[in-house]
């Protein structure tokens, strides 16, 4: 039967705020299973003990931030409004129905002033990971790492051309030692020391956000971006590391340092890692071997010169330290250069009469040259790992773990775009997003356990 209701909006009711929040609400689970008491001790050094007016409770301040990242609320002004109307948010913050909501400028002032140049956001992220470890949700044995791009708050057409010095990689000292040892083994004189000249490169320097980097990769959007280099654990896909670089930094550059950071910070006993093809470099393969870690890295596609034999057509004979060409002739060792590459050269007299010459080389002296890195053995070991049964199973898990983590960040938590400008602000966004994802996962799991 059709019915209408005449309701009045000015009736007085006696209600408990707790009754307005569902029993299975996410914020109830987080409030019950996540211990936020550590925040008080972490932020105490940044407050005065006896000067000024009483501050906003730091727990309320950070819980407001958590709400914003949990529910993808990008604006602090909008966050203030959402808390004003949402009873679950008020309950989580410990605010009564009639209590005023802290002003949005309080959040921004604390971020820009009180917590500027501090490690508070990294500390919060680390503490949440440690809680996951305490609940046996992080194994620390098998890790997945990848990077994703965040669109910088910058116009890609507003930039200047700038020449910068390229940073020296951390592995250079080890590489130089390996080069000298390799030359000695082959009876070559040690390379003379040369004055270090830093290589330079020209980049597009954003005038809007100078710390962002111009991303130009195959199958990727073009423009100014930041990169979130993330690691997740095999067990429950808890994020164990989140590190920000500008968009023009190669994925492989920060990897080993961040791996060591996790091992030192959380005491991980890492046994295996699965990585994308961007990490298939000789230094990373060597680093994994030195750490006795089973590395599985995706195959990187190479594009050989059309009409010429690809490198894999030439077989390396490790016992004789030589290459065998498709016509069963040998390429012998020649030298090892400063970049760590050995050169193997064919006999031009034999090559001149070879029926496969046109498919082998276009050099005027009719000599084929193949290079091999001094750490290539470690790279080949990683390739063998990828083709093994355990390697194939492990790599299948990669897309289910790290890719899923990135998808949740972008679709549910607003990590597709940078909210603010500058590496420090983007790092804050990335760390708090990752921390909130971990909170949600830990709380949901523990709630199911009862």
Predicted segments, located by residue:
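Anion-binding and metal-coordination hotspots
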Residues: 3-6, 65, 72-85, 95-450
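Short amphipathic alpha-helical interface patches used for protein-protein assembly/oligomerization
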Residues: 89-93
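Short, solvent-exposed coil/turn linker segments
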Residues: 16, 34-35, 94, 310
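Hydrophobic alpha-helical membrane-insertion signals
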Residues: 1-28
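Basic, short loop/linker segments at the boundary and entry of helix-turn-helix/winged-helix-like folds
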Residues: 23-66
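Generic alpha-helical segment signature
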Residues: 10, 23, 36, 57, ...
